[in-house]
């Protein structure tokens, strides 16, 4: 298989994944799989079981849909094809709040809870689970105000990685959690993260071109030596 074909395929797949994500599927849960010895995230539809975005690092969730739990929600969920592997979701320290044009640090905190394990954004924390066939796990995400006070409405950004024995830890991915703000605002806040925090696949193109150029240069040098 030629070097040109391999690189072209990588670039095409990267661009296709962004195009797919830009279609704004109604909802994507977190899909955890492995690629080249590292954990990676994509988007999947937990209803159909279909992976709808092979590469995705920004996810959405709604808080307060259940009036009994006005500051909590269970989206995004998590699925994986790594059956038999214990995954650890790492909630990173600190959260941010959407200000209409970007994010600023928030004094609030977030809990991500599953099976009696509470990961807090105050100092960073984690929870673990075993991947079983057909896994459809939905942690509880809870927004906490200061000093026991209720948090105010807003759109909040939390950061995660996922790890597992035998694999390199994933790149950071994000959940954009909406507490009683409009879907338009939620969409804008999500789009900002996609545009500003996630490396664009277009950034791969110069590296791929350099890779191709170096290959052609080596080929020319080898051809010249052979002719001599």
Q: Where does each model-flagged region fall?
A:
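Small-residue packing motifs within transmembrane alpha-helices
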Residues: 4-8, 206
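Mature extracellular "passenger" or substrate-interacting domains of secreted, surface-exposed proteins
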Residues: 22-197
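Bacterial N-terminal signal peptides
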Residues: 8-14
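A short, hydrophobic C-terminal helix/tail in secreted or cell-surface proteins
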Residues: 199-217
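Positively charged n-region of N-terminal signal peptides that target proteins for export
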Residues: 1-4, 217
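Single, functionally critical "micro-switch" positions that shape active/binding sites
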Residues: 2, 199, 223
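C-terminal membrane-anchoring or membrane-association module
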Residues: 213-228
